[in-house]
Amino acid sequence: MGKNGSQLKNLKSSIRQANLGTRPNNKKSRTRSTESHEDRQAKVQKIQSDFNLFDRQFTKRKFDVGGRRVKGTEGKPGVSRGVGEELRRRTIGAELKKRNRSGAIIDRRFGENNPHLSVEEKMLERFSREQQRRSKRELYNLDAEDVLTHGNRPLSDIDSFEEPGFGLDEGEELNDEVVRRMHFGGFEDSDAENEKEGEGAHKSKREVMSEIIAKSKHYKAERQAEKERYEDEREKLDEQMEDLQSFLSDYKKASRKSGIKTQRPIISDGDARYDSFVREMVFDKRAHPTERTKTEEELAQIEADRLRELEDQRISRMEHYQEDSASEAGSIEDEQATDNVFGFGKGLEQENEEEWNGINEEAEESEDEESVNSDTSFVDDEQLKVEEQPLVGSAIKNEGSEKASLAYTYPCPTSHVEFVQLLKGLDYKDYPTVVSRIRTLHHVKLHPDNKSRLENFSVILLQHILHLTRQPMISMELLEHLTEHLHSLAQQFPSALGISFISVVEGMRKRLAKSYVYPEIKFPEISDLLFFNLTGSIFPTSDKKHIVVSPVMLTMAESLSQSPADSLSDVCKKLYIANLFLKFQSYSHRYVPEVITAVSQALYLLYPNFISIVPGTFALPDSLKEKQNLFAIQDISLDEPQRLSLYELEELPTGLLQSSILFITLNLIEMAIDIYFKEQAFIEIFVPIMDMLQLYSLKKELLSKRLSEKLLSTLQAVSDSIESAKANRKPLALQSHRPLGITSQVPKFEEGYSLDKSSHDIDPERAQLNKLRAQHRDAKKGAIRTLRKDARFIARERRQEQRAKDQAYNEKMRKLENRLQHFDPAV
């Protein structure tokens, strides 16, 4: 191709050089060209590709080295696209045309798909197989020379017709044997027949069936005869039974008179085991169909109907209209039945005397998973608790009023005053029964209005519990049962009870603020402590933020840090709150600094001597420093710690109260170790406590024996925990990383460097791995590109096919419309 001149001149020059544009003028020069049509077409394609610069694509190299040719720098995307399109049309296009077609011609001839066999070998094997198939077909060929129609024997063998049956007259009949032998039965020789009969001739189906029937009848007759024989023997034994019994009775009497002891028969283990199985089967209760599982609404309706029926019977008995002595459904059974309906079981049972842990009375412990069980409380057995006191005086009921009878039905109260009127005259043990019956009769499934009634009743029940906690004496068993019902109602109506709890907390905070100004206002009171415990029993305490628990815990923490300690009873109340905090945080393990401060202050106040330099950094206001001499232990070696009641703190001797408070403090320290052991600041938290305990160990002669042992065990536990925390603590360090090389300005030269290498890693294994990864990546990309091209090709083919169908349909409809337009309606 010439490089000078225009594009048109260069094109003409290329055509002239390829002898494509010359045409002879005279006839002599019109000789037949030796070039074929394909050669001329190839030349045209070459000229077209050379002059079409848009059909070529060049890859610009980053570093161009003169005289160095690299494959892949120049490409022809149009040509490649055309080749790929043609290849897909031959492969994928053919498959698309064959889809949804089941018919095909499959060449199953021998060796057709085996390229290793020659044509002669294929033909020879096919011929041999054809001969084998033909020989099998001719095995029963009727066109053979020998006629073998009678028992596979030729007719020439049957040379005599004087066999039995052929000499009979026309009037005579053929017997079965003649028919069997001669009428297509074999035409066998008589000698052979005689031999077969001697050995055992072939029997017909009729003969076989006759023999089977005869044998069956024979066996049946034998069984019947044996059965009759057994019946006769049994009848004989029955007739002789009376004689045997009389003989045995006479023998027993004679042996008893003579003093002879009869030996009992020896029963083997197998017989004894068999007898036991038989007895179990005899006395085993037969299975009966059970009733279907009832819904909650049906159970509530059944229980409500039962209570109404019992109430009607009670009223009838009171009015002397009915005397039914069989109806004795007492309040205790009724309470158990209603508890089973709502899943209460036995309710919150009172804790055992050995399971009480400290000043926490554990009255409101529920089975909620967020609350803490009483067996995992944080104070030892010999600790303070709110001991159960009998409910006396006008705290609950009027002294002058007569004792009222317990009814079976009660209306749902709308106010606390109305609820108190319902309980008037009843014993405090019947209060949970009344609440249970109110909940049963006004179940939410029985009436649409019961939901609002029970929601209001839950608030009334909370008000009544708070009313009971303000009484001088209160039964812990009563609070347990009422708390159980309140917990169940809180699951149904959390919003209403949450608002009520928040209002109570707001009133507490106001009284707490007033107690800072007016010393005559005491906070916390016993009712406040019981309310704190009630909150932890009703609501989850492990949540980080809770609409009810969070304000309550803030109030408790403020009371621990700000409330004054004017007496040992105030110190005991603070330890009670600290115990509740540890119980609340037993699951979440959140650190509460007020708890550690309260424990440290209690240790400081009870120390026998004045401490000039207080170990640690816990908060110690001046008011406590002034009262240290008032609360200091003098000599309590004879005062063993015991369980205390919050109602009797003011009445106990000082030494006994000091001993019990110190024992409680040591238990709280041990429980705090278990909760806060994983804290990062565990060492800093408990080192001041360990220092205080070491000071107490110097004065252990002033303590009782049990208290001294508890002090040493607690000190050992604290010191061991601190040592373990020190061993687990790792000092701060910079982030570890591989050493970095010092940067150098000297250029790096590699021997054997080549531009063909894509990687210059000196590690051959890593280089090979990177090479395989690169190959896998390239192959994956190529496969994805191929799949996308195939998908586009299939889409184009389907569009073309659909376009052709639409065009054919439109053409057909157009022809029909033309015919209808020229159609004469008269015809």
Curated annotation (Swiss-Prot):
Residues 32-42, 219-238 have a biased composition (Basic and acidic residues). GO terms for molecular function: snoRNA binding. Keywords: Nucleus, Phosphoprotein, Ribosome biogenesis, rRNA processing. One of its GO terms (biological process) is ribosomal small subunit biogenesis. One of its GO terms (cellular component) is nucleolus. The keyword Translocase does not apply. The modification Phosphoserine is found at residue 190. Residues 1-47, 215-238, 349-384, 798-827 are annotated as: Disordered. Component of the ribosomal small subunit (SSU) processome. Involved in nucleolar processing of pre-18S ribosomal RNA. Has a role in the nuclear export of 40S pre-ribosomal subunit to the cytoplasm. This is Probable nucleolar complex protein 14. The gene is nop14.
